[in-house]
Amino acid sequence: MTTAGRYHLTLVADGREMLHGWWASEAVARGKFTAWVGRHGDRPGARITLTDDETGTPLTTWPDSA
């Protein structure tokens, strides 16, 4: 986990990691997740994932199915 926060958001498009962000608040991270889907969801091959870095558990992904 980074000092920036426990909740890690990633955007992968066409198999390349494009963006990362970390937040201490799950509520804030989920808001960012929704914003990223709206802003970047139309990129070819986009996959957005929110992970709890403390447990290693993916909390949500977009799109829902790979």
Place the predicted regions along the sequence by residue.
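Surface-exposed loop/edge segments in extracytoplasmic proteins
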Residues: 15-21, 56-61
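A short, charged, amphipathic alpha-helix used as a generic interaction element across diverse proteins
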Residues: 23-45
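Short linear sequence motifs
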Residues: 1, 16, 26-29, 33, ...
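Short aromatic-glycine-(Arg/Gly/Cys) micro-motifs in beta-strand/loop hairpins
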Residues: 1-19
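Short, mixed-charge low-complexity intrinsically disordered segments
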Residues: 38-66
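A generic structural signal for ordered secondary structure
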Residues: 4-8, 33, 48-50
